[in-house]
Design a protein with these regions (language model features):
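A glycine- and small-aliphatic-rich helix-loop capping segment at beta-alpha/alpha-beta transitions
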Residues: 116-125, 201, 206, 334-335
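ATP-binding N-terminal substructure of ATP-dependent carboxylate-amine bond-forming enzymes
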Residues: 1-131, 135-137, 141, 160-170, ...
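ATP-dependent carboxylate activation and anion-phosphoryl transfer catalytic cores
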Residues: 2-4, 10-13, 150, 174, ...
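Active-site nucleotide/adenylate-binding loops and adjacent lid/helix of ATP-dependent enzymes
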Residues: 2-10, 14-15, 21-25, 90, ...
């Protein structure tokens, strides 16, 4: 059988650069070398594209991958049919690429930017297309679409950089008039809980908004929802399939960046500790959100389940983590799809889309 040429993109000019390196290491180690010619292409924090020439993918999370002597400068050409270009001395090497697997998170990576380049180049790629990627990355747009789809979610308030600069007092008063403390403060366009904070009083709210505005010009203030954090992995194009539910006990104030990637205090429960009826409701809502957002390929959909059984939508991630401890692959492994088979399925869905 003819091998497919798969370009795995990782890194990126993003606040979630390091998370991407961890995810990419896992993906590259699990892709079947008998089925695929693999081209690992990293984007540095400065925006340089590098065709990684090493064999040890552990160099990615170690941060030493850029120093590999066999690396070459690279680019994906927007010209259809040109594929992957790499540069060595005065020579340009062209490689046909059958599919791109973006293992990148956050701004410039998960928000439709990379997807737009691949769309122009005519190269199939894993994950949702441009419009869905952009909509899912912007939490305000996600909120509006989920609301139109009739999905219960936390009440929220938008604070903009311009409005906050014009009058902090008005912005803080508006939030306090609507919500009781604590509240969550989230940049509109980041993932992995980057820039997210829980504010318990006015001074903490002001500081959290200031910090979040460093990541995005729009910030969401959300009511605090007390409940179990439940996640569902979704796979598919026209007929998406939802995995079993998983639950996260963060062991912290909330499931922030440190709890996800640094601390070992979080505990995962697969399946989630919820009733069978609630499980089916969560899975149905996950697919409803997935379809409403126009997703294809994959996404992870996150919810809260309150003590009375009410299910509240939290957010959707179009390129979920693929690290060794990430929920997306773990949920499908528990649903009967091993990690390597999941990668095969995602590549097949990309070629079908």
């Amino acid at each position: 059988m003819k091998k497919l040429s798969v370009c795995v993109l990782f890194g990126g000019v993003s606040s979630e650069h390091e998370v991407s390196l961890r995810s990419a290491e896992s993906v590259l180690n699990r892709l079947d070398k008998d089925k695929y010619h693999i081209f690992p292409v990293g984007i540095t924090k400065d925006g340089d594209w590098i065709l990684f020439g090493g064999k040890d993918y552990g160099m990615l999370p170690a941060g030493t991958w850029q120093n590999c002597e066999d690396n070459r400068r690279a680019a994906l050409s927007p010209v259809r049919g040109q594929g992957l270009l790499s540069f060595e001395n005065d020579c340009v090497v062209r490689e046909r690429i059958d599919v791109v697997f973006p293992v990148m998170h956050g701004e410039n990576c998960e928000d439709g930017a990379i997807q737009g380049l691949l769309q122009i180049a005519g190269i199939p790629y894993v994950g949702p297309h441009v419009a869905a990627s952009a909509a899912c990355m912007d939490k305000t747009i996600t909120k509006l679409i989920a609301d139109a789809a009739g999905v219960r979610q936390a009440a929220w308030q938008l604070v903009t950089r311009e409005g906050f600069a014009r009058s902090r007092e008005n912005a803080l008063n508006t939030v306090e008039a609507r919500f009781a403390y604590p509240v969550f403060v989230k940049p509109a366009g980041t993932g992995s809980s980057v820039g997210v904070a829980k504010a318990k009083d006015r001074s903490a709210l002001e500081a959290a908004i200031e910090a979040a505005l460093k990541y995005d010009r729009k910030v969401l203030i959300e009511e605090f929802i007390s409940g179990q954090e439940v996640e569902v992995a979704v796979l598919g194009n026209d007929n998406p399939f939802a995995s079993i539910c998983g639950e996260i006990d963060s062991g912290a104030e909330f499931y922030d960046y440190d709890a996800k990637y640094i601390s070992d205090c979080a505990h995962l429960y697969i399946p989630a500790r919820i009733s069978e009826q609630t499980t089916e409701q969560v899975r149905e809502l996950a697919v409803r959100v997935y379809k409403a957002m126009g997703c294809r390929g994959m996404s992870r959909v996150d919810f809260f389940v309150k003590s009375d059984g009410e299910v509240v939508f939290n957010e959707i991630n179009t390129i979920p983590g693929f690290t060794s401890i990430s929920m997306y692959p773990k949920l499908f492994e528990a649903s009967g799809i091993p990690y390597s088979d999941l990668l095969d399925d995602l590549i097949a869905l990309a070629l079908e889309a």
